[in-house]
Amino acid sequence: QPANAKANIQQQLSELEKNSGGRLGVALIDTADNSQILYRGDERFPMCSTSKVMAVSALLKQSETDKNLLAKRMEIKQSDLVNYNPIAEKHLDTGMTLAEFSAATIQYSDNTAMNKILEHLGGPAKVTEFARTIGDKTFRLDRTEPTLNTAIPGDKRDTTSPQAMAISLQNLTLGKALAEPQRAQLVEWMKGNTTGGASIRAGLPTTWVVGDKTGSGDYGTTNDIAVIWPANHAPLVLVTYFTQPQQNAEARKDVLAAAAKIVTAGL
């Protein structure tokens, strides 16, 4: 995009942020030319449930060399259930496979499913280790669900930057970070997400195909990371992170939708 269009986008994002009363982070990668639009692109934001993509990707990476891994069944105890378990709570008798935990984690943001994946991997630090192996030096996962969502301003735990997450998401969903079957599986799970309708998707034309993962936490933290297939354009990768100064602030999915609309308006 020409310089004046880019400046205009920055100005619109700045306006949006000012009117929202929070802190907004945006990173768009246009894979047509790998150009980036960044707004607070290198600042740290709490990831909340957007971190689930990296956890599931770490599992998918393991499954490249262990073809039975995703069929492995793990039990679910009553004591495993946390604050949000829409799928896991229905399977206390049978348990679930790692594939089922992965789908529940990405498509329903089931927190018990995420914790089961973390348990299998050996803890949050293993997800950080995986991020390093795909070239992401910024991502850090420190805690399990639901404490990873405390989103305390200035706390570096469970944070990344919009730019780092966008690059990793591009590598995982469109690049070579995962082998082809695993990459395709991640994309399929993200395209089937049920939680993103009011976030990035709401700011895009309805004909565009989207795969995304939302996140939310304290301080009105409202997040979405997406791979986008526009009607007549190369894929886009978009990260929108938003957090607020008051611990009990309301979620603002509308801010994410507005940011998505601003950065894709010229396409």
UniProtKB/Swiss-Prot annotation:
UniProt keyword list: Antibiotic resistance, Hydrolase
EC number: 3.5.2.6
Cross-referenced Pfam families: Beta-lactamase2
Protein name, per record: Beta-lactamase
Taxonomic placement: Bacteria, Pseudomonadati, Pseudomonadota, Gammaproteobacteria, Enterobacterales
Binding-site positions, substrate: 213-215
GO biological process: beta-lactam antibiotic catabolic process; response to antibiotic
Active-site residues from the entry: 49 (acyl-ester intermediate)
A Gene Ontology molecular function term of the record: beta-lactamase activity
Activity regulation comment: Inhibited by clavulanic acid, sulbactam and tazobactam.
Entry's family note: Belongs to the class-A beta-lactamase family.
Misc note: The class A beta-lactamase family has a specific amino-acid numbering system, sometimes called Ambler or ABL numbering and often misspelt as Amber. A multiple sequence alignment was used to derive a consensus sequence and then the consensus was numbered taking into account insertions and deletions. This allows use of identical numbers, e.g. for active site residues, despite differences in protein length. UniProt always uses natural numbering of residues, hence there appear to be differences in numbering between this entry and some papers.
Function: Hydrolyzes broad-spectrum beta-lactam antibiotics. Active against cephalosporins.
Domain of life: Bacteria
Catalytic activity of the protein: a beta-lactam + H2O = a substituted beta-amino acid
Keyword Hydrolase: yes
InterPro entries registered for this protein in UniProt: Beta-lactam/transpept-like, Beta-lactam_cat, Beta-lactam_class-A
